[in-house]
């Protein structure tokens, strides 16, 4: 952290670039390894959004003919997509139709995306944001920062609650199945307990783990130093790779079908 500033900054450009490469490779891996499905599409979009944010952080000092402000807007656009995509993924894993909550999350996402892309002064990225080992961009408007924080944490916690609720429901179904197995003295466990439900539980648990790894460190930083709320995206960038690892390493194998099957 800069002693002369209340902002917490991202890791070095080298770390940003390595993370971008990993997340991009993970998205490509999912495309070529798994059969097309809604879950695969959502996982790929999440990974692409994470990678896009990393490259925006890496380029925020200006590159490829675009200004730092352009890259900052692009970065905010990318990270704003994460909450609705994550909630939608949780619904798909659970086998539930995307309802009012998911649609509302996308509508609020579009509202913030339009704000960050088209409203002047919605994002700050100037010469003072560029350092030898880090870069940062943030929202200078206090009211917008509060609303964006509410949007971000609100939908993330909605997704967490939904995952937990679905795990509880599916677990009850499995427990009832085991009870029926005992009472009937049947040895056909696979006919009573749906293996698909077990995979759903594991996938949802890993998704919760990814959310916690993504949210908890940022939340702790915000609690310790509330002024860092304005730089939430720059703080999250250091932990985004944990979510990417969870998606490609643990959620995808339990929810997607291999192409060579």
Regions found by a protein language model. Name each.
Residues 25-29, 85-92, 152-177, 181, ...:
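Alpha-helical transmembrane segments in multipass membrane proteins, preferentially the mid-helix core
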Residues 9-23, 36-132, 140-157, 211, ...:
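Individual alpha-helical transmembrane segments in multi-pass integral membrane proteins
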Residues 1-2, 24-30, 53-62, 216-222:
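Membrane-embedded alpha-helical segments in integral membrane proteins
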Residues 9, 13, 180, 187, ...:
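Interfacial "cap-and-anchor" motif at the non-cytosolic start of specific transmembrane alpha-helices
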Residues 1-10:
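Short, strongly hydrophobic alpha-helical membrane anchors
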Residues 29-33, 91-92, 114-118, 218-226:
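Hydrophobic alpha-helical transmembrane segments
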Residues 30-43, 91-102, 167-177, 191-203, ...:
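Membrane-interface helix-boundary motifs at transmembrane edges
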């Amino acid at each position: 952290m800069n002693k002369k500033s209340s902002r917490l900054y991202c890791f070095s450009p080298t770390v940003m670039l390595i993370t971008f490469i990993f997340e991009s490779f993970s998205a490509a891996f999912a495309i070529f390894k798994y059969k097309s499905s809604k879950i695969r599409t959502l996982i790929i979009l999440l990974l692409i959004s994470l990678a896009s944010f990393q490259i925006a952080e890496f380029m925020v000092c200006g590159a490829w003919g675009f200004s730092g402000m352009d890259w900052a807007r692009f970065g905010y656009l990318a990270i704003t997509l994460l909450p609705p995509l994550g909630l939608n993924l949780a619904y798909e894993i659970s086998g539930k139709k995307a309802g009012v909550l998911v649609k509302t999350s996308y509508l609020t996402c579009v509202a913030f995306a339009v704000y960050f892309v088209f409203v002047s002064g919605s994002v700050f990225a100037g010469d003072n944001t560029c350092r030898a080992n880090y870069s940062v961009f943030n929202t200078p408007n206090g009211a917008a920062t509060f609303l964006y924080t509410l949007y971000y944490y609100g939908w993330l916690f909605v997704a967490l609650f939904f995952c937990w609720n679905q795990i509880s429901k599916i677990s009850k179904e499995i427990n009832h199945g085991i009870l029926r197995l005992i009472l009937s003295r049947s040895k056909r466990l696979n006919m009573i307990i749906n293996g698909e439900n077990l995979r759903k539980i594991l996938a949802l648990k890993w998704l919760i783990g990814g959310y916690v790894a993504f949210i908890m460190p940022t939340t702790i930083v915000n609690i310790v130093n509330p002024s860092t709320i304005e730089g939430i995206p720059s703080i999250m960038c250091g932990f985004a790779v944990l979510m990417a690892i969870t998606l490609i390493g643990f959620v995808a194998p339990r929810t997607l079908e291999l192409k060579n099957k």
